[in-house]
């Protein structure tokens, strides 16, 4: 198998539906066209400016971005986004505005320990919400209130609210 020096070679894959990236050095996506791309999984922070890839995706998975604090740059151009999975983002303290994503109906959060502001949920179009190991400093009541404030919520799963399960009983009471 030959080593590819540039990501431009991907432009030949017009039907490429799913792309998973974990690059060791930033690259330029300016000359890459992937009209069939719908699923994008980004791991790590050396993927370059992936804005050109975001316009057609419907599923975005962001993972292990240790220094990333603001997710707006990933979400604002992703106007067709339907499902979002945020995983192991230790610097994220608040969710960005979700009201500009009218097709976003499912959000899964995992290991966002510093998350302390979930107010964006109340202005979202979400129907499904799942979270595990988030908002270590949020009380059980604050977490439950944020979930209950999602206007069109049909299903929610809060598993392992924290590693010690100290908030689990409080969340159960709040939902009762």
Go through the PLM ranges and name each one.
Residues 1-8, 15-50, 54-76, 80-93, ...:
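Concave beta-strand-loop units of leucine-rich repeat
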């Amino acid at each position: 198998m030959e080593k590819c020096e540039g990501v431009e070679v991907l432009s030949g894959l017009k039907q490429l539906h799913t792309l998973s990236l974990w690059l060791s050095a930033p690259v330029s996506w300016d000359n890459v066209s992937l009209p069939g791309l719908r699923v994008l999984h980004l791991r790590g922070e050396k993927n370059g400016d992936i804005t050109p890839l975001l316009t057609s995706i419907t599923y975005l998975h962001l993972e292990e971005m240790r220094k990333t604090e603001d997710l707006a740059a990933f979400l604002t151009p992703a106007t067709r986004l339907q499902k979002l999975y945020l995983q192991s983002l230790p610097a994220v303290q608040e969710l960005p505005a979700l009201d500009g994503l009218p097709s976003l109906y499912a959000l899964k959060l995992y290991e966002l320990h510093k998350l302390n502001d979930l107010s964006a949920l109340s202005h979202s179009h979400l129907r499904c919400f799942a979270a595990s190991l988030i908002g270590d400093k949020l009380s059980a009541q604050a977490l439950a209130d944020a979930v209950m404030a999602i206007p069109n919520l049909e299903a929610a799963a809060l598993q392992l609210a924290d590693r010690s399960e100290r908030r689990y009983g409080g969340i159960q009471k709040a939902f009762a």
